Amino acid sequence: MDEHGVQTPQVTSLIVVAGLSGAGKSTALKSLEDIGYLWIDNPPLLALPGLMRELSESTEDSHVAVGLHMREHGRDPDAWQRLQPILQEMTARLELLYLEADSDILVKRFRETRRRHPLAGRNMAGGGGEALRTVKEAVEEERLRMQPVRAQANLVIDTTYLRPQMLQERVADLFRMDAHNTQGITLFVRSLGFKYGSNTDADMVLDARFLQNPYYDLALRELTGMDAPVRAFLDRDGEAEQFLTHLQGLFGYLIPRYIKERKCYFTVDIGCTGGQHRSVYLVDRLGEMLGQMGYRVVVRHRDMHRKSAK
């Protein structure tokens, strides 16, 4: 609203995608384009308010995704901090998504694609003509420079273990325009195998390895927690059902309080050894329960189709 009390036109939603070079920003932006967002990659930051004003006046329902890259941010490291409150007034929904990955993985990606890191090969601060950055040094320098932006992010995704398709699905799940999500929060419920490592972006991690393991029943070994014989096996002693009853009470208590704190996303991972039987069963059941409670739920099984493992 301006000084005369006139409502300022607003863009429906603005998703700013920032993060480390090689972490998947282009993949994330393409995913947003696929679900209906107007994709603007690396515009001059200072031009964003004017651009948002034009878009808000030209259409009633404007969903915009903007890529923020090191090249643009490096010219004025404090620009985003100054612009964020201005853009907040101009958009009904402003989200800053930050993508990162382990340094060794980023170096590997640059080597495989033969792309040049925006900071590689340049003189290091205080160095002479010989003090040129390696790719690894460039990655670490960028991580340091982008830290103020990361600190302001609504959501951080670590793409170390994410294939491009997995990242596309994750972004689409997060920002898909869903008119039926009246609760204001999206719940991600994911199964995984601890032997393959944990996700770094989970809000809560639960361990299902206390349940009897269907792996040791040869008739069930090649099946998954989505198959009826495995579900019957896990239902047999009542432990899984009792655990789910406790989870229903826990989330019935927690989620309304997270909504009150304006938390838009909550991710819970449930793991077992291989991510094939117990965690898959529990995640499917928990997803059903949370959906029946009126929440938007996204279920993902990270390791279900890996080779059978204990």
From Swiss-Prot:
Xref: SUPFAM superfamilies: P-loop containing nucleoside triphosphate hydrolases
Nucleotide-binding found in the keyword field: yes
Keyword Nucleotide-binding: yes
Domain of life: Bacteria
Transmembrane segments: none
MF terms (GO), sorted A to Z: ATP binding; GTP binding
Keywords: ATP-binding, GTP-binding, Nucleotide-binding
One Pfam family from the record: RapZ-like_N
Binding-site positions, ATP: 19-26
HAMAP family hit by this protein: RapZ_like
Similarity comment: Belongs to the RapZ-like family.
Entries under NCBIfam families matching the protein: PRK05416.1
Task of the protein: Displays ATPase and GTPase activities.
UniProt name for this protein: Nucleotide-binding protein Mmc1_3333
